[in-house]
């Protein structure tokens, strides 16, 4: 065992080692967060989860580190991994392109310093004169502080910079930078003063309010020039690592040891991938297009385990990937949710099967507070499977139904027309609708605006439904939650609004239907087929299908109405609850007629005649979806039109930036949170950002199958706030330190230096 690793990982917290002359040396805690560009480091994060320790193991490579040092860091990381039982998740980190998880370990940010062990660096003497240093501050939550060449040529007006001149530390705020960037810049300047100058330097803020003399004082430190000489906002591609593409190909590669003891690799599949492709006896490499995972089977050989990361490096070199491409090593039965999400199906232990989303106890409490008859945690696995299949997505969004009211209108010639209340719940696949739902919370009215888009609705109608929804929200002063609903993927609350009386018919006005009042009689041949979905009286719905055998599914219940009979067809995989819901649907779509119950396999000729004859149909049960954990992203559109995604690991409410649009992926639904300070273009493109996020999502989710909700700052529903570890509704009014507050504290701190 490496002596420096003795006792490693036994207690919670962060531990860092540096590679010095090919040896592992403990790194001083007071220097955590400072990394020399010429060095390599090993970073271990230990946490206690319900009494069990778990580990994330990172090895960090500076941009100027030697190949030998980098190799030593990788080898020693494997040794530490073995010491911890081979279960840590390993991460390869490269300077400037670290994972958000790594950056989140350092609350004051990460600072890159020139030099290293091999170059003979020395500790800073706070009383000794030394040349000026310029730092580029990037990131709003995960801060990177990179040392750059001193001079105005290294600066731009869209970012913030720190100029360290010894007795003065200047914080330059680019005119185009945002308030959150500026706040982080001051926070980054304070450690430079405290750590490098023993608190004896003054911090001087250079922004639009700075005097000419203050701005001029920094010019000598920059080697001449003035703020006017600084380049415009950077529009380069330095954030390309965060850009997501729709065309990334996800591939799976087998890593194995052949009969001669030589490690081999070969590609075994492309997306869609199945969990069954992974063999416990071997190792596998998953190439996601933006990063690489190495999966270690529990029965793989020691050589395969040791060589797998080395092979990953060779694979990336062969593919021409950048050296900073993220690599993670995961072990069987301890796969993170992000890894499992790349597979179309993933069998979890029965007690872990969920609705596609992982819930904390706090989130469960928020759900049960609004819908007391629904408690997922108490359900048997088979019941949870039925809920996953029938209850509809976004089931956490279930506000209290009491005293609620609704207004429904379809789009006719791209205009909203009211729907007669007696026909609420009847939808046509050729139309789009807007539904306004009003409910009360603590005596105050709250609103949800649904825009429902039929599968056969025209693109103009779909676009118009979104426009009308925005208009209605504006009339409500931005207080509504906007929810896009695609036919067949209605959220649980949307279904419950109609209390079991929802029917989706084929066609629409443009398709030649007479009108909605003829729904129970109009059909050219007197034959109609409906698929039944639902778990209780409140969420049952009937979806009309094409009258052919191929529309049937063994996992479901169907209602077949013919001129002479009405059949209730029970698939072999259907539950008793689904059968009961089917009987209620018969009363709804085919009232006043005798019902004939037919079990799958016992159909008569008249039944098949109504479907145009026997035919093949789906008989296999859909497999379980992998559990997905909530994730928060800061999303922007780059000047080139690409989606830039920056994930916030271990996120909290404080990560919701007032100046930005954020995307919260709950694992079930996707929320678009619009900050009050976001610009008009970002507000206008909020839904587009979420749609692009889903399109570039490497999992099997599709745009149509994912519910998108748009919410404004200050109007967050309980389903949204419950995803966060804690929520303070007054935070933005009095809970956060603003840039102006932080700036006002600077003179007070400087006064103590004099």
UniProtKB/Swiss-Prot annotation:
Keyword Metal-binding: yes
Renumbered residue ranges of the record's region Actin-severing: 1-120
Renumbered residue ranges of the record's region Disordered: 209-238
An example Gene Ontology biological process: actin filament severing
Positions annotated to bind Ca(2+) 2: 556, 578
Gene Ontology cellular component list: actin cytoskeleton; cytoplasm
Tissue: Tail muscle.
Source organism, top-level taxon: Eukaryota
One MF term in the entry's GO annotations: phosphatidylinositol-4,5-bisphosphate binding
InterPro entries: ADF-H/Gelsolin-like_dom_sf, Gelsolin-like_dom, Villin/Gelsolin
Record localization: Cytoplasm, Cytoskeleton
Main location: cytoplasm
Binding site for a 1,2-diacyl-sn-glycero-3-phospho-(1D-myo-inositol-4,5-bisphosphate): 101-108, 133-141
Actin-actin interfilament contact point as annotated region, ranges: 68-71
Induction annotation: Interaction with actin is suppressed by PIP2.
Positions annotated to bind Ca(2+) 3: 659-660, 682
Region ranges (Actin-binding, Ca-sensitive): 386-751
Ranges for the Gelsolin-like repeats: 22-71, 143-183, 266-306, 414-463, 538-580, 643-684
UniProt feature, compositional bias: Low complexity: 210-220
Residues binding Ca(2+) 1, per UniProt: 430-431, 461
Pfam entry (one): Gelsolin
Annotated family: Belongs to the villin/gelsolin family.
Described function: Calcium-regulated, actin-modulating protein that binds to the plus (or barbed) ends of actin monomers or filaments, preventing monomer exchange (end-blocking or capping). It can promote the assembly of monomers into filaments (nucleation) as well as sever filaments already formed.
Protein name: Gelsolin, cytoplasmic
């Amino acid at each position: 065992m490496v002596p420096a690793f003795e006792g490693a990982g036994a207690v919670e917290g962060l531990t860092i080692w540096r590679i010095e002359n090919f040896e592992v040396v403990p790194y001083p805690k007071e220097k955590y967060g400072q990394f020399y560009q010429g060095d390599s480091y090993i970073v271990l994060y230990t946490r206690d989860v319900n009494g069990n320790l778990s580990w994330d193991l990172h090895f960090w490579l500076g941009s100027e580190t030697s190949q030998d040092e980098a190799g030593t860091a990788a080898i020693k990381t494997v040794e530490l991994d073995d010491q911890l039982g081979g279960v840590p998740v390993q991460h390869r980190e490269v300077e400037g392109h670290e994972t958000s998880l790594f950056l989140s370990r350092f609350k004051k940010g990460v600072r890159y310093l020139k030099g290293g062990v091999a170059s003979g660096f020395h500790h800073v003497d706070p009383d000794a004169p030394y040349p000026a240093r310029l730092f580029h501050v990037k990131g709003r939550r995960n801060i990177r502080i990179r040392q750059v060449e001193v001079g105005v040529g290294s600066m731009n007006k869209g970012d913030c910079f720190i100029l360290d001149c010894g007795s003065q530390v200047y914080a330059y705020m680019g005119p185009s930078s945002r308030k959150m960037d500026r706040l982080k810049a001051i926070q980054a300047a304070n450690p430079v003063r405290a750590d490098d100058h023993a608190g004896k330097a003054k911090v001087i803020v250079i922004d639009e309010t700075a005097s000419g003399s203050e701005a001029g004082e920094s010019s000598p430190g920059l080697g001449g020039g003035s703020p006017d000489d600084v380049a415009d906002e950077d529009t380069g591609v330095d954030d390309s690592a965060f850009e997501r593409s729709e065309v990334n190909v996800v591939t799976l590669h087998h890593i194995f040891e052949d009969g001669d003891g030589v490690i081999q690799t070969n590609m075994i599949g492309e997306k869609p991938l199945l969990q069954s492709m992974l063999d416990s006896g071997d190792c596998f490499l998953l190439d996601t297009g933006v990063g690489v995972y190495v999966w270690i089977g529990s029965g793989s050989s020691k050589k395969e385990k040791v060589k797998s990361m080395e092979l990953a490096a060779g694979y990336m070199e062969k593919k021409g990937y950048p050296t900073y491409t993220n690599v993670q090593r995961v072990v069987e039965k301890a796969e993170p949710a992000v890894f499992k999400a790349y597979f179309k199906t993933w069998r979890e232990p029965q007690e872990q099967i969920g609705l596609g989303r992982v819930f904390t106890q706090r989130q469960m409490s928020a759900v049960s507070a609004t819908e007391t008859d629904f408690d997922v945690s108490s359900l048997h696995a088979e019941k949870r499977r039925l809920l996953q299949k029938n209850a509809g997505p976004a089931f956490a969004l279930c506000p209290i139904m009491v005293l609620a009211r609704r207004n429904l209108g379809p789009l006719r010639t791209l205009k909203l027309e009211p729907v007669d209340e007696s026909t609420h719940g009847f939808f046509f696949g050729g139309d789009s609708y807007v539904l306004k739902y009003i409910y009360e919370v603590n005596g105050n009215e709250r609103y949800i605006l649904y825009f429902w888009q039929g599968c056969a609705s025209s693109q103009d109608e779909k676009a118009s439904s979104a426009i009308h929804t925005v208009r209605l929200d504006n009339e409500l002063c931005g207080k509504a939650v906007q929810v896009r609903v695609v036919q067949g993927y209605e959220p649980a609350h949307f279904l419950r609004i109609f209390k079991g009386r929802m029917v989706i018919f084929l066609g629409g006005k443009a398709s030649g239907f007479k009108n909605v009042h003829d729904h129970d009689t109009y059909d050219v041949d007197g034959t109609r087929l409906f698929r039944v979905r639902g778990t209780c009286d409140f969420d049952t719905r009937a979806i009309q299908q094409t009258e052919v055998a191929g529309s049937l599914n063994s996992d479901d219940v169907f209602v077949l109405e013919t001129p002479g009979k009405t059949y209730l067809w029970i698939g072999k995989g259907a539950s008793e609850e689904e059968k009961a819901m089917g009987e209620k649907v018969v009363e709804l779509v085919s009232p006043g007629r005798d019902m004939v119950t037919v079990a799958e396999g016992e159909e008569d000729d008249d039944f098949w005649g109504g479907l145009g004859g026997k035919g093949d149909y789906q008989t296999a049960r859909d497999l379980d979806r992998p559990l997905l954990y909530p994730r928060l992203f800061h999303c922007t559109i780059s000047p080139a039109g690409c989606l830039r995604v920056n994930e916030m690991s271990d996120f909290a409410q404080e990560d919701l930036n007032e100046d930005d649009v954020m995307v919260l992926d709950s694992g079930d639904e996707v929320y678009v949170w619009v900050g009050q300070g976001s610009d008009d273009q970002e507000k206008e493109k909020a839904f587009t950002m979420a749609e692009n996020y889903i399109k570039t999502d490497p999992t099997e989710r599709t745009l149509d199958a994912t519910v998108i909700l748009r919410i404004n700052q200050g109007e967050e529903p309980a389903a949204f706030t419950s995803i966060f570890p804690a929520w303070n509704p007054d935070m933005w009014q009095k809970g956060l330190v603003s840039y102006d507050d932080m700036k006002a504290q600077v003179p007070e701190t400087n006064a103590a230096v004099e």
